[in-house]
Amino acid sequence: MRGFFGKAIFVVLAVFIMMPLLGIEAVRASELQQHVYDRAHLLSKAEIGKLESLSAKLGAKRDTDFIIITTKSTNGEDIADYTGDFYDRYGKGSTAILTIDMTNREVFIAGFKKAEQYLDNSRLNSIRNTISSDLSNENYFEAFETYIQLSYKDMGIKPGVNPDNIFFTWWFQLIAAIAVGGIAVSIMLYHAGGKVTVNGSTYMDQRTSDVIDQYDTYIRTTVTRERKPSDKDSGSDGGVTKGGTSYSGSRGSF
């Protein structure tokens, strides 16, 4: 009996000792999660490293995986089904996936779970239109970087709100802040006079708008969305994976 209790105590102690180590390994696995699957060899190792780092950092802030897949061919499978199969096998939770099929020169962007709500068909169309010219010019790194940045930005704006709205632009907010500040200063001088301690920046909303859930300024490069006529075979293409997960989508040629 004593031997049994001795073994039981040993097992319990071993479990408590191993738990912190298992937690560390889980964190490491999360940090090392792959986000770029360049099967078509469109990127250099350095470019892959930069995209992995950007995706991991911005993805952690939005609790969303930003995935990039390039393939020489989908072997006859529709690109939307190809993307859905990937999510069924490897995806979990909120995920955005950009897939490039080099044989058919086709691009597809999909949003799953929370990303399906925040990256709806309309927002994905806007993102795809913005990166289309870079894809056509074989500037793949720039296109993928912009996809991550715009997806990150749109994931911070409540569903149903147009992310291209003029109120979200920094220059409009600056002009509005200066105008409001100028009016306030004029009123104060007219009624009271004295030392002026108010300026335009006093009234500028640094968080852009109350419709934004989370907004920080990690993105260092200025990303401008481009409006271009849609190709005849492009547009919204949401659906459901074979595994039963619904998604938003946008597809087109480049």
UniProtKB/Swiss-Prot annotation:
<feature type="compositionally biased region" description="Basic and acidic residues">
    <location>
        <begin position="223"/>
        <end position="235"/>
    </location>
</feature>
<dbReference type="InterPro" id="IPR007621">
    <property type="entry name" value="TPM_dom"/>
</dbReference>
<comment type="similarity">
    <text>Belongs to the UPF0603 family.</text>
</comment>
<keyword id="KW-0732">Signal</keyword>
<feature type="compositionally biased region" description="Polar residues">
    <location>
        <begin position="243"/>
        <end position="254"/>
    </location>
</feature>
<dbReference type="Pfam" id="PF04536">
    <property type="entry name" value="TPM_phosphatase"/>
</dbReference>
<keyword id="KW-1133">Transmembrane helix</keyword>
<protein>
    <recommendedName>
        <fullName>UPF0603 protein YdjH</fullName>
    </recommendedName>
</protein>
<keyword id="KW-0812">Transmembrane</keyword>
<keyword id="KW-0472">Membrane</keyword>
<keyword id="KW-1003">Cell membrane</keyword>
<feature type="signal peptide">
    <location>
        <begin position="1"/>
        <end position="29"/>
    </location>
</feature>
<dbReference type="GO" id="GO:0005886">
    <property type="term" value="C:plasma membrane"/>
</dbReference>
<feature type="region of interest" description="Disordered">
    <location>
        <begin position="223"/>
        <end position="254"/>
    </location>
</feature>
<feature type="transmembrane region" description="Helical">
    <location>
        <begin position="166"/>
        <end position="186"/>
    </location>
</feature>
